[in-house]
């Protein structure tokens, strides 16, 4: 017999994360010498992985029979358990089949995804281990076959059918089966009203309030479509001889593809029905097509199901449409119009009644439909856009004329506005350097002179090299009286610096226009007899010097800002201003450290707390310095990775690390070395292409590395924060969860041994994850020994070792589930970053348990 009923899901009350149940033993099934033991056999079947041929040929009778066993419309939150209620005396093994649909992995909420699958396996174990009569709630009525009424007070009659079931590999046996359909939701369901009105309503689950427990739009559409199908089925059923005959159908495992199943009675009857319906329809249509609806004649039509469950279409297809299309088109349109109007009215009524008095707005339904369709095409859309963009940019960048034109326009624009850019940059730098004044300290800023000029009349463009500016902080008398802020005036150093900057900018503008002005700088006077370096005739040197000068000036400003905090470090030894030692160490190592290691070193220096008087100030200063340290390390990394000449880098380092006198002598010492480079003149076009391409490639590579590092560590930080948030949320309810666990009426006595056969896994990871979740569910129900059958590829051979290790270390069900959550979280993080996980689940558990 087959009985549909709603059950109260005992597994919904389980606090899986805090369950203290011990794990059971696990082993691989071996049929030798184990035939006479009392055990249960559970076969988990994922209906989404069944072959279409098996569904059409073998399962057609079951899906279209009076019992409404349609596996194609099985939802993700619904399971079907088929049990052997007539246990044979000579066999102590009782079999069950659990039909469900595997839900896809959810990268947003790993916990809900794992608990959803775990609930399905727990429901399968619950119904398989429970007594046969406990899963029915009302009484079984008389059957029209050879079976009689079962004397039980807690069963009810829905519809009975004899099933020919192929049980494992022991040959077909006539078994009396019981089917229990339950919803995997968080609300307990206690059916009180048997749905016995029509066979099409067998799968609906009623609640005491009279409302449907599902609030999904697809359920109502499927239910409405079943009513339309029932109308056509009733007309076809009238043509059968003996409409109350018992139907037979067969169920076979998906692995028996080579076997030819015997044609069942339902298949024969269905073929006869279709043949007779076609003949009757053809004869009636030859007579008069418009009288078909009034005369209660039948049309054979097929159902087109939308697999996304967003809606279903009914398309009526007459077999002889080519010959009689003109005569029956009007009748078909009238019939389709009536069916469509009835469906719309029924949909509105159903939504109004079964949605707690609040109909679902049309915009919400449209949003669901759009989201489901958008998720399927967004990946292809992104791939096509990136491919087209790559093709376009690849063709343009290989075109030398296009590249040269872009670079020419870019550098012409930069050449015209170079003076304004340099002036604004230097003014901002001077204001930043002279903005923060100490009352107890005076600033003596010594600026190195600006060297400019040329001895080569062929050079049209003149370069301007700014040497690094060094600030010397000299302490004055601390007892000096405070000056009036209103009477403050510019110091001599400020006036000299402003005068030098103005003169240098004026001189540089004159040289750019071709006016050879006289150099008034002392260093230029002393170096008249020396041969000056030759400037590259290409315009890209101006842009390169501009970028290098900007980076060096920003680097110098950050270094001097950190240097100015040294006296504060001496007063507060535990503060976090120890960056200068790190910067010096960075320069000694040649800039080999990355920004990550530099920032980690800076965090380590903050370990020792300082005195209580300056703790708050130190924390604020440390937050400001962290950002400047990261920017400084990034600039140093860009300068070290960019293809500049060694002479320019060493010259800038000497200017940065020495006093003003040594900085003046440094360019003079480099004159003989630069004379060797003056002899080699590069062509304008070739030099621009080579240098610009190499420079741009290096900059792009450095920026991409930085973006990858930032994306990787930001994702990990967000993931760790999410894990901590989930752990805190779960920990808040741990006490009430444990109290609820103590009040549950689970059987403490060990139950029978269970053999599990899985026919739903497609990948190795999914197969191992499914086996571990089934192990957790079996442990919760006190299964002493769990056997796994059908491990032909050897993916579960390490599972007994994992179970032995977990039992040895005292792991519980909740501890094991938390370890599985960690593995799933780490794997999704690796996939998001682009790293594929090498270890499988069982290998990871062996290494981390």
From Swiss-Prot:
Residue(s) carrying Phosphoserine: 96, 130, 190, 204, 213, 226, 271, 302, 341, 431, 442, 444, 463, 492, 497, 504, 538, 583, 628, 633, 652, 702
Renumbered residue ranges of the record's region PKA-RI-alpha subunit binding domain: 335-344
Region (Disordered): 183-210
Modified residues annotated as Phosphotyrosine in this record: 301
Recorded GO CC terms: cilium; motile cilium; perinuclear region of cytoplasm; sperm end piece; sperm fibrous sheath; sperm head-tail coupling apparatus; sperm midpiece; sperm principal piece
Post-translational modification: Phosphorylated by STK33 during sperm flagella assembly.
Bias (Polar residues): 183-205
Region described as PKA-RI and PKA-RII subunit binding domain: 219-232
Name of the protein: A-kinase anchor protein 4
Protein role: Major structural component of sperm fibrous sheath. Plays a role in sperm motility.
GO molecular function: protein kinase A binding
Annotated InterPro entries: AKAP_110, AKAP_110_C, RII-bd_1, SPHK1-interactor_AKAP_110
Free-text note on domains in this protein's UniProt record: RI-alpha binding site, predicted to form an amphipathic helix, could participate in protein-protein interactions with a complementary surface on the R-subunit dimer.
Species, as recorded: Mus musculus (Mouse)
UniProt keyword Phosphoprotein, yes or no: yes
Keyword Phosphoprotein attributed: yes
